[in-house]
Amino acid sequence: MAARDATSGSLSEESSALDLPSACDIRDYVLQGPSQEANSEAFSSLEFHSFPYSSDVDPDTSNLNIEQNNSWTAENFWLDPAVKGQSEKEEDDGLRKSLDRFYEMFGHPQPGSANSLSASVCKCLSQKITQLRGQESQKYALRSFQMARVIFNRDGCSVLQRHSRDTHFYPLEEGSTSLDDEKPNPGLSKDITHFLLQQNVMKDL
């Protein structure tokens, strides 16, 4: 009987010793447990965020991507040679029409003007302008004649009077001054003056 009790007590002690963790096991668990849990949580979080669903996309980020795409599209639109060329052509056409309105408005004698020379010069220039209008190769000449008409209408025809052989209003020395040696008038081409003198417009004085 005593031997059975002793054996039973020995087995109970061994069972208790086997069930309880050792001090080393407890220490290892304390040191490794939190790290393993953190790594497990981080891995789970990484797996969760690696493949977001479409409903989880930030709307602000989506809007930013749309704005960037729109900006890229707009930049490529203006860099397109065909679009750029069309825009420049429309701008040139608008500028040309504005210049035409300006020259027509200020290139004719004012109502009530009694200056017959200005009227004669204006008529001569207007005829030449009509001939040049619509000729792509004569754009510069057209603008030169239009500007000359504005200047003569504004400042008078003293330049022509100084160089005309028919004028009697200037001394011979001044009238014989070479046109090429004279200081040029801003906006007035000497070629236009030569053209008018060859047309003999001074006879209408």
Swiss-Prot record:
Give GO BP annotations, semicolon-separated: DNA repair; negative regulation of double-strand break repair via homologous recombination; positive regulation of double-strand break repair via nonhomologous end joining; positive regulation of isotype switching; somatic diversification of immunoglobulins involved in immune response; telomere maintenance in response to DNA damage
On whether DNA damage is a keyword of this UniProt record, the answer is yes
- InterPro entries given for it? SHLD1, SHLD1_C
Q: Where in the cell is it found?
A: Chromosome
* Alphabetic keyword roster: Chromosome, DNA damage, DNA repair
- Where is it predominantly found? nucleus
Query: What are its GO cellular component terms?
Result: chromatin; chromosome; site of double-strand break
**How is the quaternary structure described?**
Component of the shieldin complex, consisting of SHLD1, SHLD2, SHLD3 and MAD2L2/REV7. Within the complex, SHLD2 forms a scaffold which interacts with a SHLD3-MAD2L2 subcomplex via its N-terminus, and with SHLD1 via its C-terminus. Interacts with ASTE1.
Function summary = Component of the shieldin complex, which plays an important role in repair of DNA double-stranded breaks (DSBs). During G1 and S phase of the cell cycle, the complex functions downstream of TP53BP1 to promote non-homologous end joining (NHEJ) and suppress DNA end resection. Mediates various NHEJ-dependent processes including immunoglobulin class-switch recombination, and fusion of unprotected telomeres.
Miscellaneous comment: In BRCA1-deficient cells, function of the shieldin complex is necessary for sensitivity to the PARP inhibitor olaparib.
**Protein's recorded name:** Shieldin complex subunit 1
Organism field: Homo sapiens
